[in-house]
Structures are given as C-alpha cells and as structure tokens.
C-alpha cells in the first residue's frame, strides 16, 4: 500500500461541503475520521437523488446500505483500463468494456455499485438509465486505488455484490500486490472459483468471455 494511504481522507473538506450542500432534504452527512457518513439510515431512493446532485468530481456508491466514496482514478489506473479495453477488442471484437458503469448489485438489487468497467455486447446499454440491471453484463471489473477502503470494498464487498446478481465473472486488477484475480461461477451470493495470477503471466478468462489476457504490460504500471 502506498505510504500515507491509511491516513488519506476520502475527499477534501471543500468537496464534502459541496456535497452536503446539495444533499436532499432529510439526508444529513458528516465527515468523520476522513470518511463521509450519513447520520441516519439511507434509502436507495435517497442515495440515487444524492448521487444525481453530487459534484462531478465526487463518485458515490451505495454498498451494504451505506454511502461509499470511490477514489478518483490516477494515471496508472486509467492506463490499466485502456489496456483492458485493447485486450478485449483484440480477442472479442463483439464486446465492449464500458467505463464508470452504474450497476444494481447485491441481493434484491438493493446496492448501487459504480464498476470501473462492465463488459457487455456492443450496444447493450442503449436506452439504460444511470443504474443498469446485471442481466447482459458478462464481467464486472474493478481496478484498485491506493485508498484505505480498497481492501474491504474491492476484495470483500464487490465480489459479494456482483455474485448476488449473477454476473458471470468479476475481474479484480489489484495494484497493491500486482495480481489479477478472476472470480467466476456465482452461486448463492458467492463466487465458487477464485484464481489469482501475478502480473506478467497469462490469465484465462472463463466463459462467457473465453479468452486469455496477456498481462505483461501491467508490469509497466506497478507502483
């Protein structure tokens, strides 16, 4: 983990004040120990309204009934995403990797996850709103950021949330330990198969993707 990550706040005080200023009536926010929290239980409807009003620089999610803030991607994060897009286009030109995809996740679709990437057939999201149902999403993708919540969010909460709505594959590109982790075979809210691969080794993606990632380039983005 990058030095200082554990102490880094989720957002600057100025951004928090902007967010709190546009919060819907009845949604009370606070900044505690650098984390944004709601003072009262938050409904899905109130979250969606808050997210619509949030400043463009603030990326919000609703995970396990709680408000979460995603870190703004840095340069290496963006380069890794482009690498994945290129790999997908090379092997499966019928598919697209859609960035910053709002997904209805968790049991009963009560969660709202903003996936770094969602792999689906070209044109799949045409006509969709801000948050899409999981049907038709072949793979959810998360690229870890160097923030203190990434362990719980990307390694614990997201696999459960995506498996609960039967997304066939969850791909975690883990920048803390330079691995690519493939989760597959969702069943009863868990992925039955989890395979971890160091950067620089071939990574086989199971059906419905059914192609192999060349991860050698990822070593250029180790930090």
Q: Which residues make up each language-model segment?
A:
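Gly/Pro/Ser/Thr-rich low-complexity, intrinsically disordered segments predominantly at protein N-termini
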Residues: 1-223
């Amino acid at each position: 983990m990058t030095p200082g990550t554990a102490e880094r706040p989720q957002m600057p005080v100025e951004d928090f004040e902007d967010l709190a200023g546009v919060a819907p009536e009845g949604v009370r926010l606070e900044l505690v120990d650098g984390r944004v929290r709601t003072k009262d239980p938050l409904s899905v409807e109130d979250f969606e309204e808050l997210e619509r009003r949030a400043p463009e620089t603030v990326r919000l999610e609703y995970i396990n009934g709680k408000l979460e803030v995603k870190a703004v991607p840095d340069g290496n994060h963006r380069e890794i995403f482009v690498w994945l897009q290129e790999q997908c286009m090379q092997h499966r030109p019928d598919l697209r990797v859609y960035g910053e995809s709002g997904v209805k996740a968790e049991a009963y679709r009560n969660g709202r996850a903003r996936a770094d990437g969602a792999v689906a057939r070209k044109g799949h999201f045409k006509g969709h709103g801000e948050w899409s149902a999981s049907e038709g999403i072949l793979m959810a993708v998360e690229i870890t950021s160097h923030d203190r919540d990434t362990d719980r969010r990307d390694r614990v909460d997201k696999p459960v949330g995506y498996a609960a709505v039967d997304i066939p594959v969850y791909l975690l590109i883990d920048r803390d330990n330079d691995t690519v982790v493939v989760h597959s075979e969702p069943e009863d809210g868990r992925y039955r198969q989890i395979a971890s691969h160091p950067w620089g080794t071939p990574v086989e993606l199971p059906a419905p993707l059914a192609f192999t990632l060349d991860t050698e380039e990822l070593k250029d983005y180790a930090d």
